[in-house]
């Protein structure tokens, strides 16, 4: 080989070697890029949110009245249909009034006697007035006549009270509905002996329109919501909260109710308090004892944060955590407070801010401290709002 040929081959060899080295470096960088786990992130944004709390509960009658006899006797008639609607004052049972009618008539007779005796006593006093101080009537006799007249007046008052008592007992033989509502089954039939003060009710009347819904809420949640309102994190337009109702069959009750009050004590065994709502029930769709779920309007949270539920995991202690992608495309674990599930999302009250990137897919490939390649689950313009 000539000297010129050797000089020609040397630069070519150098160029080829450089090209091979550059190619290897490019493949290494490509492999490094390809090796980054790919994850999907949800970009956190804040927005006003109507906060509703869904709680289990049961329906209760607005008013309940147990019908009991106030006098003793034999039931002659039952004057209602079981399961029907009755009006206050409507006759339900008729107890044999014979004895009570006789007592009433006797009391009226005694009253007449007392009134007659009182009339004579007062007439005697009038006759004695011009004779007082003469030899015909002494002062003592006059004083005695006045005392007799007063005793006669007292006897009239007592007789009138006896008549009124007898009249009331006679009226009690007609057992009436104390309230308007729906009456249940009767525990007695015609011919049964009932007694004044018996422990067993004759029937029960329940007012169903409106109707109560009693729900329970943990004392912790109750205090948290109360503090949110006091601190301004939760805005309420008025003191009354609207309530929606979901019935046992999953259907939403068409009429809305209002929250009336919360109990003043906490149940020591369950750590919960009772909330009571009232609902209109004109068609008697709701019956006492039904299991329902009440959705209570707690107010509006102006800067609420919602993230998909799959982005939240729990530690063995039950604490909520999320994985986020920071500005360096590195994964970070962050503790959060997931206060409430709303649909398929968690309401986050602490731990996140607007603009954070929460990993919602590819969690099994993401490790804290590692770099990842992130794609968003929402358009950029939506996430930036």
UniProtKB/Swiss-Prot annotation:
Cited Gene3D superfamilies: 2.40.30.170, 2.40.420.20, 2.40.50.100, Helix hairpin bin (1.10.287.470)
Cellular component GO terms held in the UniProt record: efflux pump complex; periplasmic side of plasma membrane; plasma membrane
Covalent lipidation (S-diacylglycerol cysteine), chain numbering: 24
Induction and repression of expression: Induced by LeuO, part of the acrEF operon.
Keywords noted in UniProt: Cell inner membrane, Cell membrane, Lipoprotein, Membrane, Palmitate, Signal, Transport
Region annotation (Disordered) ranges: 366-385
Annotated SUPFAM superfamilies: HlyD-like secretion proteins
GO molecular function: transmembrane transporter activity
Keyword Lipoprotein applies: yes
Lipidation (N-palmitoyl cysteine): 24
GO biological process: response to antibiotic; response to xenobiotic stimulus; xenobiotic detoxification by transmembrane export across the cell outer membrane
Compositional bias of kind Polar residues: 373-385
Superkingdom of source: Bacteria
Coiled-coil region: none
Compartments, record wording: Cell inner membrane
A Pfam family hit: HlyD_D23
Membrane topology: Lipid-anchor
NCBIfam families: RND_mfp
PANTHER family assigned to the protein according to its UniProt record, in alphabetical order: ACRA/E-RELATED COMPONENT OF DRUG EFFLUX TRANSPORTER, MULTIDRUG EXPORT PROTEIN ACRE
The protein's assembly and partners: Part of the tripartite efflux system AcrEF-TolC, which is composed of an inner membrane transporter, AcrF, a periplasmic membrane fusion protein, AcrE, and an outer membrane component, TolC. The complex forms a large protein conduit and can translocate molecules across both the inner and outer membranes.
Family listed: Belongs to the membrane fusion protein (MFP) (TC 8.A.1) family.
Name of this chain's protein: Multidrug export protein AcrE
């Amino acid at each position: 080989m000539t000297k010129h040929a050797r000089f020609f081959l040397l630069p070519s060899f150098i160029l080829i070697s450089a090209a091979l080295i550059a190619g290897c470096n490019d493949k290494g960088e490509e492999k490094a890029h390809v090796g980054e786990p790919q994850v999907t992130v949800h970009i956190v944004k804040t927005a006003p949110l109507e906060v509703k709390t869904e709680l289990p509960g049961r329906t209760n009658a607005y008013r309940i009245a147990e019908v009991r006899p106030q006098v003793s006797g034999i039931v002659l008639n039952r004057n209602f249909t079981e399961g029907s609607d009755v009006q206050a004052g409507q006759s339900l049972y008729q107890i044999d009034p014979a004895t009570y009618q006789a007592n009433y008539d006797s009391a009226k007779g005694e009253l007449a006697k007392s009134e007659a005796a009182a009339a004579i006593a007062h007439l005697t006093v009038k006759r004695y007035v011009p004779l007082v101080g003469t030899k015909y009537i002494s002062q003592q006799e006059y004083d005695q006549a006045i005392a007799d007249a007063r005793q006669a007046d007292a006897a009239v008052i007592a007789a009138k009270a006896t008549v009124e008592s007898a009249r009331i007992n006679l009226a009690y033989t007609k057992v009436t509905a104390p309230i308007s509502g729906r009456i249940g089954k009767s525990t007695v039939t015609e011919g049964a002996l009932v007694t004044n003060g018996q422990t067993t009710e004759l029937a029960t009347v329940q007012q169903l329109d409106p109707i109560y819904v009693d729900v329970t809420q943990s004392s912790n949640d109750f205090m948290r919501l109360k503090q949110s309102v006091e601190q301004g994190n939760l805005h309420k337009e008025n003191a009354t909260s609207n309530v929606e109702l979901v019935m046992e069959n999953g259907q939403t009750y068409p009429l809305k109710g209002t929250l009336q009050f919360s109990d003043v004590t906490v149940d020591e065994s369950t750590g919960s308090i009772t909330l009571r709502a009232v609902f209109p029930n004109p068609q008697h769709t709701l019956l006492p004892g039904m299991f329902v779920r009440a959705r209570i309007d707690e107010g509006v949270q102006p800067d609420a944060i919602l993230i998909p539920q799959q982005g939240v995991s729990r530690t063995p202690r039950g604490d909520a955590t999320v994985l986020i992608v920071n500005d360096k495309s590195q994964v970070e674990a962050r503790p959060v407070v997931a206060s409430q599930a709303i649909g398929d999302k968690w309401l986050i009250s602490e731990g996140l801010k607007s603009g954070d990137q929460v990993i919602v897919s590819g969690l099994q490939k993401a490790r804290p401290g590692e770099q990842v390649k992130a794609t968003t689950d929402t358009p950029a313009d939506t996430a930036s709002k």
